[in-house]
Amino acid sequence: LEHSLQTATRALKEDASDEMIVAALLHDIGDELAPNNHAEFAAAILKPYVSEKTTWIVEKHGIFQMYYYAHHLGFNKNERDKYKGHEYYSATAEFCEKWDQSSFDPNYKSLTLKDFEPYVRKIFSRNPYSN
């Protein structure tokens, strides 16, 4: 939970949209429920309530996040490059660089889950964009 709170706190402090703050909070919600495809799981939950761009960022963040650690595990850290040229490539790389990969700091002062409740309620009370 702390990683997600840090990610969302960083997004909020950088004046991200309410939608992106909620996406930052929930981007890893699938870690325990769907460890083999956690990003796709999180994107599926958010998809009816967020833009195509936000859905894509959440869905692909796992691949983009590999840039920071995959080479230590014998994998290709540049796997994300297969999406170069995609209109959301830069936004996804930025999401990972500024908020996701830097949110493992045990000394970071995160907001609480309660602080994000109004954002979550706002986004999930929208009329769904899609089903």
Each predicted region: which residue ranges?
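Divalent metal-dependent phosphate-bond-processing catalytic cores, especially two-metal-ion Mg2+/Mn2+ enzymes
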Residues: 1-5, 9-17, 48-56, 60-131
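His-Asp-centered metal-binding catalytic motifs of divalent-metal-dependent phosphohydrolases/nucleases
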Residues: 10-42, 58-62
